[in-house]
């Protein structure tokens, strides 16, 4: 049986891990989005996040910073959700299972972004998209694709938390079956 102090340290580690993974995802994801449309960042996200006032000389660095700012809080929320599950779930390799659930969550965010990008690329014309763009945007279709990628990653994250919880429930169920068969 783990002590309360050990559980508390592990809970903090889960939150830290979740925030770091989400931040890394945001920084890397924005590098791909920036490659699709730098205008989405210069015309929208940099102003939206206020980084355009920081006088950064490297737009790619700025895109990564925006990614971190836009995703660390999601990692914090997910970390708290997974800590609650961690504290009440009694399974073997509990910490490992939580880590895997967080990685599943990020995988779904990546998948959501990719699916949204493909939908924008092949099925949505920017003229009928309803996406607000600055007047004079040079590559509006690319802008739309980057905007869809951004939104898709959040929808993927929502699906990912569901998938992560299902994963944890299945792990718990397997342990319950395993314990029942050993007691028989």
Where are these regions (language model features)?
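Cytoplasmic juxtamembrane regions at transmembrane-helix boundaries
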Residues: 2-3, 77-105, 168-184
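Cytosolic juxtamembrane helix and N-cap/initiation of the first transmembrane helix
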Residues: 2-19
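Hydrophobic alpha-helical membrane-insertion segments
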Residues: 15-31, 100-121
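Juxtamembrane non-transmembrane "cap" segments at the membrane-aqueous interface
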Residues: 35-45, 114-134
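Perimembrane loop-to-helix junctions flanking transmembrane segments
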Residues: 38-59
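Hydrophobic alpha-helical transmembrane segments
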Residues: 55-74, 139-162
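Hydrophobic alpha-helical transmembrane segments and immediately flanking/interface helices
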Residues: 90-91, 95, 128-149
């Amino acid at each position: 049986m783990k002590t309360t102090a050990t559980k508390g340290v592990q809970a903090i580690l889960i939150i830290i891990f979740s925030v770091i993974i989400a931040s890394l995802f945001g920084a890397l994801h924005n590098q791909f989005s920036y490659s699709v449309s730098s205008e989405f960042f210069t015309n929208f996200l940099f102003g939206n996040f206020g980084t355009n006032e920081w006088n950064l000389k490297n737009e790619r660095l700025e895109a990564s910073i925006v990614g971190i700012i836009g995703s660390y809080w999601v990692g914090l929320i997910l970390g708290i959700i997974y800590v609650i599950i961690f504290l009440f779930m009694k399974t073997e390799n509990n910490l490992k299972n939580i880590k895997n659930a967080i990685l599943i969550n990020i995988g779904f965010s990546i998948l959501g972004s990719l699916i949204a990008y493909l939908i924008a690329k092949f099925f949505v014309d920017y003229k009928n998209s309803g996406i607000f763009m600055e007047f004079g945007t040079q590559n509006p279709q690319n802008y739309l694709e980057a905007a869809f990628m951004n939104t898709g990653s959040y929808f993927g994250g929502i699906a990912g938390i569901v998938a992560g919880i299902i994963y944890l429930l299945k792990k718990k169920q397997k342990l319950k079956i395993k314990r029942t068969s050993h007691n028989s």
